[in-house]
Structure formats: C-alpha cells, structure tokens
Amino acid sequence: MQQTYGLERIGLMNPKVVYRNMSPAWLTEQALLNGEGVLSDTGALVVRTGKYTGRAPDDKFIVDTPSIHDYIAWNNINRPISKEKFNALKSKILAYFQNRPIYLFDGFAGADEHGWSPRGIFNFEGGCYAKCINLNPEKEPYIYNAIKAGTLVENVVLDEDTRHPNYFDSKITENTRAGYPIDYIPNAAQPGKGGIPTVIIFLTADSFGVLPPISRLSKEAAMYHFVTGFTSKVAGTEQGITEPIPTFSTLFGEPFMPLAPDIYAGMLGERIEKYNTKVYLVNTGWTGSPYGIGSRMDLKYTRAMITAALNGQLDNVPYRHDMRFNVDIPQVCPGVPNQILNPRATWDNKKSYDIMAKKVAAMFYENFKTKYPDMPEEIIQAGPRV
C-alpha cells in the first residue's frame, strides 16, 4: 500500500501516486517528460503559464464566518464567499485529483511574506521570485547568474537554436519571472532570521517624478504612508498593465492584507515606538519628470541610499523639511549626487514640478479623506499638505 502522507484528512482520496519533497533535478526531469517546459542553455527550466501571466486579484475570496467577519476589510479584493460555495469548489478540485499523480511539498505558501515577532524579523520564503524583463548581467548580476539548473523561469522567450534566454523580448508578457532558491544569491542572509529592526524601508514607485528618492518619516508619518500605500503598478505585475499606473494600495499590498487597515497600522506604530525604529520612504520611481519624459531612478543610487539608511549614515546628516509632502529629506547621502536627493532640482522646469507636486499631494489628501476618515488626527496631519 502506497504512502499517502495523510492527504485523506483533507479529502484527497485515491491518488495514483504521491511524490513528496522531491529534488529540483527530479522535478525538472518530470516536467520535461510531461512536455511542460524546456531547458535554457544554463539548465533552467523554462515554462509558459498560459493565459494567466500575472496576478489575478479579482479571483480572491474569503469564506465569511462569524469568527472573522468583523476583522476583515471587505472590499472588491477581499470578497466574501459562503461555506456552501467553498465546499462545492473544494469537492470539484478533489474530484479532479482522483487517480492522478500528486506532487507534495512541505513548505509555506506565499512568495514574499515576512513577520515581526518579539524576537525579531523572519522570512517565510525560501527563495526569490525575480522579474526578468530587460534583465542585464551588468546591472543585476545576482539575478542573472541565479538562472541556472534548479531555477524555474516563466514566460521568457528562448532562441530556438541556442536556447539562450532573450530577456528583452516581451511578446509573451512584460511579467517574465525567475524563481530560484535563496542560496543561489551569494550574500543572502540565512536562515532568514534577524533581530529587532532598527530601520524600516518603505518602497514606492512614483510615476509622477515628484516624491524625493529617500525621506525620513516620523512614527505618525510612517503609519500614514503605510496605510496609504502609494505606488505605481508597473508593466506586467497584473494582467493588462503595460505602463505605470499610479495607485493607492492600502498597506503597500492591499491584495495580501485582508484585515482592516487600522489593525495593521496600530501594530506598526506600537513596534516603532517600542523599539525606536527609524523609518524611511524610498522612491524607486521616476526622476526629472513624469513617466514618459523623465527617467527611472538609477538602481545604484537606490542601493546607496538604502545602504546608508541601514548603516546609520543618515542619522546625523542635515535634513530639509519638505513642506508639500511633509517629510524630511537628507541633504547629503554617500554615493548619491546631492541634486538627485532634491526632486525639484532634477526637473528642468521648476514651475512644472510645483504644479505636479501639488497635484500629487491633493491625490494623497483625497484618498485618505475618502478611505480612512476615522483615523486618529495625528496620523491624518502627518500626510502631504494641499
């Protein structure tokens, strides 16, 4: 009698065979035998994901029960489904698996979830899920060199003869990806645990080109920007996105944060105050002008700013308070030209910058007033000024 590893407890009966925790090499071989992918010239398994080449946030539902009803932020992303409908869908899936081979893996689900416990921060993931579009070995050597045997590559076009990946070809999708184990990155911190964070970095991508590339936030401002979650959806991250779309995604990841936002904001504020953690907002978006005219923030400058923040090199430098966005901007940062730190200075037309900055600040104001009218006044006042 074959081992089923307790799958019958979730109703999964009569599998043809169960393969559990098999090696990447074995799984790659099975995928090739099943015609599910091909090998690149570096030995990576390259597959196509069909018509779904990005997240499908409209397909998320939560079973609505009395025990969770009052804690969920019900909206067009967190949509309720009855227990009866859930059980019907589950039965359909279980029926599909009858007499089929099952590939079982013991691990956590989720690509980028992490946690903060009283003992410190920790990662749930055991690898990286990197974007590959326009991948350049000079600018991103770690990702480029990680695409080898044991790596799963999605929707990247291969040369028919050489099987060499063409990372600049987006005819399948802009959202080309590579998933690889964490130990493929030479400087990865393992086992994915750290102490209490002394610095928190919020990443945003401003397609308007007006937010500073790095700014320091007070506790209240950190809670404001955490709840607001301003960024831009960039090409390929979701179906149908071909150019950046400015968006306010609650908590910088509304599709992944099902609880009411004030719960998460309160948790963050408590930890910032308890541990005296510094918080910075880093803009990886556009500089010099909006998308289409300006340029994307150079990755080397972003890395230099984050390194300086983490190393405490921004603790004692002079700061300038930006009255429009209500944040403190460092005047100097190692490895970054001073002009880059001041977004207004990067625009040729300063009047155009002022007009755009006022427009973006008004967007912040209207979004917060509409979505979070009951937030504490000190958090509301920590946002941009109209």
Residue spans for each PLM region:
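A noncatalytic interaction/capping subdomain that flanks phosphate/NTP-handling catalytic cores
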Residues: M1-G107, P118-V386
